[in-house]
Amino acid sequence: EISMLSAEEADQVGVAAVPPQVLAAKALECRPLGNIGVAYTYNEPLVGWEYVRDTARLVKDNGMDNILVTNGTASLDVLEELLPFIDAMNIDLKGFRESYYRRLGGDLETVKRFITRAVKDCHVELTTLIVPGENDSMTEMAEEARWIASLDAKITLHVTRFFPRYRMLDREATEAE
């Protein structure tokens, strides 16, 4: 549960800020071990999009790749600043109903615009976590698949299972079928 640590707890477990220059240098140092670049992931990396941009620029200057894993809830201006440095993205598409996104504190249209723009210049894969009773209707899933295919029929959609955790213990795991 590292994402839920307070600043004091983070200090106790040794969480530290890593400047862009240090991360880019470490990525390059690990190249002989097979490292190809940096993936910006866990929590939401675009909360600190300037850090991603600054680091990705340095990583790209070193001839390495940048992969962004995001919820796609960022402005197109931010995306435009990042695209020259990002080689691939995995974007969470949490469902295909505006009401579901609103309950999660997001906006489906913002995410759709982000995805639509990203696929024009970047390798994009999408991930949808199927939550029972929330975004698991065949109608919604078919509508989502049609929309994705309308952008590019070759976009990979990863469909993942939900498991009850943290504040969502009130439902069962997604069935494997």
Ranges and model annotations:
Residues 9-14, 103-107, 171-172:
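Short glycine-enriched, charge-decorated loop/helix-capping segments at active-site entrances
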Residues 3, 171-177:
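Short, intrinsically disordered, charge-balanced linker/junction segments flanking boundaries
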Residues 110-168:
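Conserved C-terminal portion of the radical SAM core fold
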Residues 4-9, 42-47, 72-79, 88-105, ...:
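Conserved radical SAM core fold
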Residues 80-96, 145-156, 177:
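Structural recognition of alpha->loop->beta junctions
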Residues 46-53, 57, 102-125:
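P-loop/Walker A phosphate-binding loop and immediately adjacent motor/lid segment at beta-alpha junctions
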Residues 1-88:
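Conserved Radical SAM active-site core
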Residues 52-66, 136-155, 174-176:
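Short, electropositive alpha-helical surface patch
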